[in-house]
Structures are given as C-alpha cells and as structure tokens.
From Swiss-Prot:
It comes from Escherichia coli O111:H-. It comes from the Bacteria. Residues 210-411 are annotated as: Inverse autotransporter. Residues 40-212 are annotated as: Required for periplasmic localization. This is Intimin.
C-alpha cells in the first residue's frame, strides 16, 4: 500500500543525497535477501469460469473476486465447491451479515480461498499456426488469467510442464519470426510483450508484498515537512509477521532517517508485537534508540514507545549558542474505530520527555520535563482518503492544532474497492491492518542547554592590609568578547572601600581598595561580579571575599590574623619579658597544631623561641627580652603566608634613666586642610614612676607641629605625659619620632593626611551627557551624578529623603518626587559632606496611556499648559528613554491642555518626551497618548 498525504510543517535542505543512498542500499539489500519469501504471499487474480479453487482457508492465499453478470455468492460456492461458511469467514469485515453477503450483486467484490488454479497450457497455438492475441497483449497466449504470480505457476506446473511451457513460448516466438505475414516490428513487439507481461507480473508480486509505503510530500518551503516510510515483511505466516521498517523525513530543516525491525504475533482475535528502532538525525548528528510494543484488535490499536538517547551533548544544529542532545521519553497511543461506522476514528496519545530544556513543541519554547496529551478524530469516507484533526495540549499551556489529509493507494487491490465506502471496514480489522506502519514518533525530540559562551571566575580571594590597593585576578572566557564587568561592592563601600577599574585598556583589569581595619570587627567583605559580553549576554554571579587586616598578611591560607603584645614596654635588663600572642585562622576559623615562626624586624632583643605551635584555641605565644634600651618590632608568620604580620612596636627602657615607655597617635588619618590635627602622646618613666617636667623632642618627616615647624619640644606633666599636634595643608604620610635626653628615638605609627572631601556643585545630567547646574524643572525618574573628590578615594552615599531622591553606590541620584533632599557622602577616612537638592519649579510625572478626558482626570486637570512646558523638560534632560525607568520605551506622546480653538474643533495637541514630534489636531480618543502631569 502506498499513501500520500499532507501535514502542517515548516523549514533547510542538505544531506538529502546521503539519506536516499542509505535508504536505497537498505531496500536493495532487503529485496535481494527476501526475493523468495515474497512468492508465498497473497495473490490477486480475475476468476474464469473453468478455474478451480481448493477449499482451504489459508490467510496468505486469498482471492479478491468481482462478481460478474449472472453470478451470485451461492453460484460461486456451488461451481467452485466452496462451502458458504468458509466464504463468510473471509468476508465478515465486508458485510454486516451472511444474508447481506448472499445478496451481493454483480460488480461487488468478495474474498475467496485460493490454493491452486488450473492453468491450461494446451491453449497455446501449434507451431506455425496463426497467432492469437489475448487480452493481455501477448501474441499466441490464451491464458485466461490476466495476472499470475510466481508461486501459482510453481504450484501448478511440474518441472516437465514448466519446461514444455517455456518451449512453447519460444516456439511461438520463432514461428512468428518466420512468418512473412508479419511486419518488421511485429517480432520485436511480440518479444517485448512477452517480456513485459512477465516483468509486470514480477513487479506486481513485489508491490503487493511490500506491506506499506507512506509518502508525505510538501512542495513548498524546500520540501520541509516531507517524509517517506516503508514497512517491509521479510517473513510472513498466518500467525507471525517479521518485518523491517525504514524511513526518512525532512522536518524543521532536519534530515532524519529511521531503521527498525519487529515482530507481530497474530492470535484469533488480537495481535501482540514489539519493535526496535535506531533514529539518526543527519543534520544535527543525533542518535536515538527506540523500543516499542503493540497490541491490536479489530477496530482498536494501542502502542507504547520508549525513546533513549545514544548521543551526548554537542553544538546545536539550528539554535545559536546552545548544545543539544536527544531527550529520553516515552509515549502511549490509542486508536479506535466504530464497528457500526468504521469510517470514523478517534485518537488519544500521551507523551512525556525528560530534561531541563526540552523542545517538545519547538526549539523556541524550551520546557522542563514537558508532557503533552493529544486527542484527535479522523474520517475515512473511502479507503483512498483519510482526513484528520489533532489537538495537542502540553505543559505550560502550550498547544497546537494539526490538520491532515492522506491519500492511500493500495497496489494489491483493484481501483474499485479503493473508492467505495463499504471497503473502509476492512482497514479497521486485523487482517486489513496487518502491514500498517509502526505508530511512533519518528522525529527526535531534543534537549538543549545554553553554551558557556561567557564565564567569569575569580580564582583567589583577596587579603590585605587596610587602605591597600589589591589587584583582582579575573579569568574571563567569552565567545563574543568581554564588554564590561558590573560589581556589587556596597558592603565594601559602606566601610570606605571600593572596587574600581585600574584605568588600563583591558576591560577585566580591576583592583580593590581596602577600607580601614576595624578593631574587634569581622573585617571580611563579600562582593559580587557579573560579566557582560558585546552581544549583551551575561555570566553567572561570582563572589569575591575580601579580608582586611591591620597589617600585611594572607588568610585564605592558614595565617596569623592577630599578633599583639601584653604590654608596650619592659625593662632592658634581659630578665623582664614581653609576651606576644599570635592567633592563627583559616577563613575565620581558628587552627590548632599550626607552626608559627617569629622574627625581630627591627631593634635589639632576644626571642624566647623562633617558633611555636598553636594550641586548641589557635594561639601561639613567644617571649621577648632585651638588655639594650630601644624600640623593637616583632613579626609572626605561618608557612602558608606570603608576608609576615608585624605587631605594634614595644620599648625596652633603662630603669635608672628617664625613658619614653609609650608613644601613640589619637588617629591614623586626618584632613589635609591645615586645621585637622593629629595628637601625639608620649609617656616618660624612671624607676617605674612618671617623670614630671621632662622635655621631649618631637620630629616629623611631613606636616607641621602646632602649625609651625617639623621639630618641636614638649614638657611632661605630672603624669609623665607630653603631647603635641601635627597638621598638614597637603596630602601625604607622616612618621613622627620622639626622644628624651640620653635616650633612643621612638617612632609612632604612620599617619596619612587626605585632601578634604567635597562635592562639585556641577552635576552630570546622564540622559544628556552634559555637566552643569541641576535644572529647576524636573523629569520624574530623571538621573544625574554627583562628582566627589578628596578623602581616601572610597565613598559611601546616603539620601536623607528617599521619597524625593535616592542615590546608589556610584553617586547616581534618581529623582522620585517634588521636594528638597539631602545627599550625604562619607569617605573611607571618615570625612562626610552633604549636597542639598532644592525643590524644582515644577516636575513632570508620566502616567499611563489614556484618552484626553481620562488624562485630565488622572492629573487633576494639571496637564501641561503648552508644548513649551514639555519642550523645556526635553531641553533640560534630553530624551526620556536616556534614563533607566524609561529605557525600554520608544515614545512618550503626552497630552497638552486644550486651547479654546482646540475645544471648538474637539481636538488637542501632543508632545513626545522622547522624539519631540509635536502634533496638533489630535483626536481626543487617540489610543497611544500618555497622561503626563505637571506638579
């Protein structure tokens, strides 16, 4: 049987030749291997009056016979010696009852059992006699059957008779060649006629045993939607059918071939079968295994299929920036027909596939583990034509509707039964559907995943001393090139740190400016980064951990996080000791049994040990003694640290002399304005007692003492303390030293002077890319950026009036309401300044699209009085879609209050805040105009 149909399909070409070579090779091999098995199938002949039928009901040997004038089923039964019960058993699907069969009129078809046919070879003409041309078109051949299969010939001819028959054919041809009465082409025609008749017989025998061939051709769109399928029996008996099925299809711009085999086992009233398929998508290089089962009865079919991928992830054939592979899944199918009205059929199917991004409906609608149920009806008015409609409803409310029409031409049957309604019933029976195609999804359902076209990785966290600048190591892989990296460093900025671009040409060259170390605080900050490529694709968010220390160290390994002395001074007698304690942690967790090495960085002293191991609390201790007066600095380091951590300096003093035992500053940063002073304090002791009225000499390498000079003396008070102040009018770093007569210099911790923090009065209007004064007419959600300088270079922002204006971490201000707002900025060195936003003369607020009347109501009759009002806003702020809130909009056409002339004409005027484009005489019910209010 060959069918032709059309379906709704779309879309590419290529690899067609490869596909058909594969099919041709498969079919050729199949025909070669199975050429003898075809000879034992069904045979179709026209019956002559002297043909004899043997009454053996064999499913493979059936005769489709059309009653002639004067013939009835009863007369055929008597003349051929076939019982009516046998004939009825073969015709139940054609007639509603035996009595109806007996009423069959001339021209109607019945099925008769066929085993052997009498063939009269004696009808051949004697050699040399005049030729007789039969209806078949072969001269001298009076065979009363127009078609004869090889098995019938073999069954009715002994070897001798077959040889005799062949000899007679040859003799007949020789006689005709000798006859002078024949014209020159007659011999050739005769030979070709004999050969053609035999070839037609062979071809018909092949065609009627092919089972089913289904062809669907779509003439448009490069034949997208076309398919070709064959079911080919290679072993066929009454109770079992073994078959192969091959197919190819070009659907959605993909060439897919299917190769399968299976068996069907026929019981008296039902059929059980199984099949195995390999599906190959040549376009996308996808391979899938299919395993299915079948259960059929008269008027009912069911099947279940499982689909299992045999190929893995690879670049998608037709979906950019995605990989694809076959999705695993299954489907269950049911088809039923009404016995009383077999032309009408119904279909029910459920399919389920598994994966995160499966294209069950199409590659633009990816779903997770999608399923779909299909219901359909079909109508077959005559065997030649079937029309159907299917509705499929799936996960996520996806659905589609498919209309189809098939034309089925069966080579094994005459034309008449294919266009008469009463023969539809046969298609619905087991015998009539014996060679039907396997019901399965021959298209490979695919699963997709987004390619890693852009990835961002930060392999190392950052650990550094306060106020240091640390380079961030970024690893970026981008298919289309890196455009930018967006950071969320709000936690870092809140303490005066920030992430900033280094200013190089590379888009991935960033550095971290660390804030001040907070004594007793966690000093650990989390920042995130996301990369964007030149096509707008974004990477995953990546987190960076920044740990700030009071001195240089690295702690993403096992490292010393804190190193302190139990006192600031001791006797330089070689006996009194200062005890240091080092705390070792990894990622904030104390570490036991870690060796810590100690070293004297500066000064003269002796360590109690060069190393120690941490206890259960992560603590390691060491003592320091000295017989030499002076200042000493000690460091601690683990094996995994790249630099040691220094403790604060300690002082060894000579007890019998007045000595400085302590020096400190009240802060480590100051404003370089000549006024912000750092106060230094020293303590002078002798024999364990404070020394009163003793002179202390101070020196500095930067700034001025008391605003006068870089050297200054101060006198101790009754508590033995002397103080002095240091200021600077320029930015820089200062180291102050102090000494007493006969003693050593003692250095204080380094102090940094920063320029004063200030905000420029000029702002950057972001949508217009200009710098100037803040306009006194506002566009709601307009944005500008404040420019700040001074401080330590790290800033945090805060708005005191967020209902009026908000500010982000970069100093970008967004206007939200009409009024006055104060924006504060604080630098990492704790300087704070403010910027006051003054209320505007008026503000423009954009509402929704509305008719003129509704717009007036929405705005409380406060529409713009003229186009000039909005033109001024445009001139001050630029196009509205230059700001985040309006970024996606292409037009904001706004109503203008009607003039008197407008009221008479029943129209109004508009102005567009994005394109300008002023209009007059606009209908008051225009659908795409916004209510824009003036506040």
């Amino acid at each position: 049987m060959i069918t032709h149909g059309f379906y709704a399909r779309t879309r590419h070409k290529h690899k067609l030749k490869k596909t058909f070579i594969m099919l041709s090779a498969g079919l050729g091999l199949f025909f070669y291997v199975n050429q003898n098995s075809f000879a034992n199938g069904e045979n179709y002949f026209k019956l002559s009056s002297d043909s004899k039928l043997l009454t053996q009901n064999v499913a493979q040997d059936r005769l489709f016979y059309t009653l002639k004038t004067g013939e009835t089923v009863s007369s055929i039964s008597k003349s051929q010696g076939i019982s009516l019960s046998v004939i009825w058993s073969l015709n139940k699907h054609l007639y509603s009852s035996e009595s109806e069969m007996l009423k069959a009129a001339p021209g109607q078809q019945i099925i008769l059992p066929l085993k052997k046919l009498s063939v009269e070879y004696g009808a051949l003409p004697v050699l040399g006699s005049a030729p007789v041309v039969a209806a078949g078109g072969v001269a001298g051949h009076t065979n009363k059957m127009t078609k004869m299969s090889p098995d019938a010939t073999q069954s009715n001819m002994t070897d001798d008779r077959a040889l005799n028959y062949t000899a007679q054919q040859a003799a007949s041809l020789g006689s005709q060649l000798q006859s002078r009465s024949l014209h020159g082409d007659y011999a050739k025609d005769t030979a070709l006629g004999i050969a053609g008749n035999q070839a037609s017989s062979q071809l018909q025998a092949w065609l009627q045993h092919y089972g089913t061939a289904e062809v669907n051709l779509q003439s448009g769109n490069n034949f997208d939607g076309s398919s070709l399928d064959f079911l080919l029996p290679f072993y066929d008996s009454e109770k079992m059918l073994a078959f192969g099925q091959v197919g190819a299809r070009y659907i959605d711009s993909r060439f897919t071939a299917n190769l399968g085999a299976g068996q069907r086992f026929f019981l008296p009233e039902n059929m059980l079968g199984y099949n195995v398929f390999i599906d190959q998508d040549f376009s996308g290089d996808n391979t899938r295994l299919g395993i299915g089962g079948e259960y059929w009865r008269d008027y009912f079919k069911s099947s279940v299929n499982g689909y299992f991928r045999m190929s893995g992830w690879h670049e998608s054939y037709n979906k950019k920036d995605y990989d694809e592979r076959p999705a695993n899944g299954f489907d269950i199918r049911f088809n039923g027909y009404l016995p009383s009205y077999p032309a009408l059929g119904a279909k029910l199917m459920y399919e389920q596939y598994y994966g995160d991004n499966v294209a069950l409906f199409n590659s633009d609608k990816l779903q997770s583990n999608p399923g779909a149920a299909t219901v359909g009806v079909n109508y077959t008015p005559i065997p030649l034509v079937t029309m159907g409609i299917d509705y499929r409803h799936g996960t996520g409310y996806e659905n589609d509707l498919l209309y189809s029409m098939q034309f089925r031409y069966q080579f094994d049957k005459p034309w008449s039964p294919q266009i008469e309604p009463q023969y539809v019933n046969e298609l619905r029976t087991l015998s009539g559907s014996r060679y039907d195609l396997v019901q399965r999804n021959n298209n490979i359902i695919l699963e997709y995943k987004k390619q890693d076209i852009l990835s961002l990785n930060i392999p190392h966290d950052i650990n550094g001393t306060e106020h240091s600048t640390q380079k961030i190591q970024l690893i970026v892989k981008s298919k289309y090139g890196l455009d930018r990296i967006v950071w969320d460093d709000s936690a870092l900025r809140s303490q005066g740190g920030q992430i900033q671009h280094s200013g190089s040409q590379s888009a991935q060259d960033y550095q971290a400016i660390l804030p001040a170390y907070v004594q007793g605080g966690s000093n650990i900050y989390k920042v995130t980064a996301r990369a964007y490529d030149r096509n707008g694709n974004s990477s995953n968010n990546v987190q960076l951990t920044i740990t700030v220390l009071s001195n240089g160290q690295v702690v993403d390994q096992v490292g010393v996080t804190d190193f302190t002395a139990d006192k600031t001074s001791a006797k330089a007698d070689g006996t009194e000791a200062i005890t240091y304690t080092a705390t070792v942690k990894k990622n904030g967790v104390t570490q036991a049994n870690v060796p810590v090495s100690f070293n004297i960085v500066s000064g003269t002293a002796t360590l109690g040990a060069n190393s120690a191991t941490t206890d259960a609390n992560g603590k390691a201790t060491v003592t320091l003694k000295s017989s030499t007066p002076g200042q000493v600095v000690v460091s601690a380091k683990t094996a995994e640290m790249t630099s040691a951590l220094n403790a604060s300096a300690v002082i060894f003093v000579e007890q019998t002399k007045a000595s400085i035992t302590e020096i400190k500053a009240d802060k480590t940063t100051a404003v370089a304005n000549g006024n912000d002073a750092v106060t230094y304090t020293v303590k002078v002791m002798k024999e364990g007692q404070p020394v009163h009225g003793h002179s202390v000499a101070f020196t500095t390498n930067f700034g001025m003492f008391n605003g006068k000079s870089q050297t200054q003396n101060a006198t101790t008070g009754s508590d033995g303390r002397a103080t002095i102040t240091l200021t600077s009018s320029s930015a820089g770093k200062a180291t102050v030293s102090a000494t007493v007569s006969g003693g050593n210099d003692v250095k204080a911790p380094e102090v940094t002077f920063f320029d004063g923090l200030k905000i420029d009065n000029k702002v950057d209007i972001l949508g217009k890319n200009v710098t100037g004064d803040l306009p006194n007419i506002w566009l709601q959600y307009g944005q500008f950026k404040l420019k700040v300088s001074g401080g330590n270079g790290t800033y945090s922002w805060h708005s005191e009036n967020t209902n009026i204006a908000t500010v982000d971490e970069s100093g970008k201000v967004t206007l939200k309401g009409k009024g006055t707002a104060v924006i504060n900025v604080t630098s990492g060195d704790k300087q704070t300044v403010s910027y006051t936003i003054k209320a505007p003369n008026y503000m423009i607020r954009v509402g929704n699209k509305a008719s003129y009347a509704n717009a007036m109501s929405f705005c409380g009759n406060l529409l713009p009085s003229s186009q000039t009002v909005l033109s001024n806003v445009y001139n001050s702020w630029g196009p509205a879609n230059g700001y985040d809130h309006y970024r996606s909009m292409q037009s904001i056409t706004a109503w203008i209050t009607q003039t008197e002339a407008d009221k008479i004409s029943g129209v109004s005027t508009t102005y567009d805040l994005i394109t300008q484009n002023p209009h007059k005489d606009v209908s008051l019910n225009a659908p795409n105009v916004y209510a824009v209010c003036v506040e």
